[in-house]
Amino acid sequence: MVAIRPDEISTIIRQQIESYNQEVQVSNVGTVLQVGDGTARIYGLQQAMSGELLEFEDGTVGIALNLEEDNVGAVLMGDGFGIKEGGTVKATGKIAQVPVGDALVGRVVDALGRPIDGKGEILASETRLVESPAPGIVARKSVCEPMQTGITAIDAMIPVGRGQRELIIGDRKTGKTAIAIDTIINQKSEDVICVYVAIGQKASTVAQVIDTLTQRGAMDYTVVVAANANDPATLQYIAPYTGASIAEYFMYKGKATLVIYDDLTKQAQAYRQLSLLMRRPPGREAYPGDVFYLHSRLLERAAKLSDALGGGSMTALPIIETQAGDVSAYIPTNVISITDGQIFLSTDLFNAGFRPAINAGISVSRVGSAAQTKAMKKVAGKLKLELAQFDELEAFAQFASDLDAATQAQLARGQRLRQILKQPQNFPLSVWEQVAVVYAGLNGYLDDIATDKVIDFCAGLREYLKTSKPRYVEIVSTEKQLNDEAEGLLKDGINEYKQAFK
């Protein structure tokens, strides 16, 4: 047996003491007092931050929404069926973040950026905070580039610019989503990343939208964020912010982005539900006092960045659903005051067969005219006025039996102008096509064509110009201007086709 000397024993003990490493993990832990209706009240968590992510024993994640004197009110991002009274809750020390990057393009994700399209995991390059601050005044630049929707009525009368917030408002089933989808389809050759956020919609409706985008090849540059009607209210509340964060990544990379929020009425209702369950005092229409801030902090994130920051942009098209055309309700007035204009869709026009059913009288674009293409600005300058005068005359003509020739001519022109603004769904038009039909309508070329033949004439004219006047198409498409040469070619083309049409 080998004898161990006493000094060796002391050396071994010293080495073991020195190599001993005691890891102390300090966790901010609380106890569940009450749980139900997608919310939980937690005792403890004295150090919790507002908006901090909390982790429950069953793996459910919540957000600390109410920080009260003796408890914390949290909203759950899951059903919470596994949470029990007395269970422990751990504060993570993190604020909600979502994965962002090129890997998300062409994918369908939930409000936390997790894939729900069955195409495997998303290997995102980085993450962004769900609630990111909006760009400041110095970081912005005034809107100066057009965001072509492909819808003649909008691009001619209510132009949208890159970095603008343009509200789409109307009753249910008036074609609000159709306008948004057409705008996404029209970005195919424009190098714009699109984000479609579906809030509180039926899963079948969202599937239909994704199917349409896939068929038209639009999913190649689109991200869909879906918080369906059966998802927890918390996910419906944060889904728009997730969409904005995904778009912001591309905006700060210098790219143009387009975000559709479909629709913010459902988000406000989800937030109202959470606030009432958290026992926050209700205000007008039972919405909480900060419901204006809910939408303003979201829509202020849309911007046209200065050249120093890369000149990227985020254009927002929020959608609001009204009840019986009441635009003076709480949420519609809030969002109208935040946005840079609104496109109002009328049920009466929709039912009368005018689609898109845009009411030009109360639809405005406050900053878009600065971004309108020169060709369209030159051609469509008096279109809105002519239509407004026609609406007044039409109402007056119902009571007058004998009208003078000038009034009859104006009524006839107005009816034809309405026809040229009709457009089938998922059929966006390029700038040169829009300029041609608006020019023909406003300059009297359609006055002697029967009203029911106007749509056929316009379709034929577009085909004729494409084949017989390629120089006109080239000038307007590349220079975005209607110079003397292009105008001459357009006049010749209209007259030539008119002879053949008759």
Curated annotation (Swiss-Prot):
Superkingdom as given in the UniProt entry: Bacteria
Molecular function, one GO term:
ADP binding
Any single Gene Ontology cellular-component annotation: proton-transporting ATP synthase complex
Q: How does it assemble?
A: F-type ATPases have 2 components, CF(1) - the catalytic core - and CF(0) - the membrane proton channel. CF(1) has five subunits: alpha(3), beta(3), gamma(1), delta(1), epsilon(1). CF(0) has four main subunits: a, b, b' and c.
Q: How does the protein associate with the membrane?
A: Peripheral membrane protein
What is the annotated role of this protein in its UniProt record? Produces ATP from ADP in the presence of a proton gradient across the membrane. The alpha chain is a regulatory subunit.
Q: What is its EC number?
A: 7.1.2.2
Q: Quick one: signal sequence residues?
A: none
Q: Which InterPro entries match?
A: ATP_synth_asu-like_sf, ATP_synth_asu_C, ATP_synth_asu_C_sf, ATP_synth_F1_a_nt-bd_dom, ATP_synth_F1_asu, ATPase_a/bsu_AS, ATPase_F1/V1/A1_a/bsu_N, ATPase_F1/V1/A1_a/bsu_N_sf
This chain is encoded by the gene named atpA
Please give the catalytic activity noted in the UniProt record.
ATP + H2O + 4 H(+)(in) = ADP + phosphate + 5 H(+)(out)
Q: Which family does it belong to?
A: Belongs to the ATPase alpha/beta chains family.
The positions annotated for binding ATP are 170-177
Which keywords, in A-to-Z order, does the entry hold?
ATP synthesis, ATP-binding, CF(1), Hydrogen ion transport, Ion transport, Membrane, Nucleotide-binding, Thylakoid, Translocase, Transport
State where the protein is found.
Cellular thylakoid membrane
* Annotated site, Required for activity, chain positions: 363
Q: Tell me the protein's name.
A: ATP synthase subunit alpha
The record's CDD domains line, in alphabetical order, gives: ATP-synt_F1_alpha_C, ATP-synt_F1_alpha_N, F1-ATPase_alpha_CD
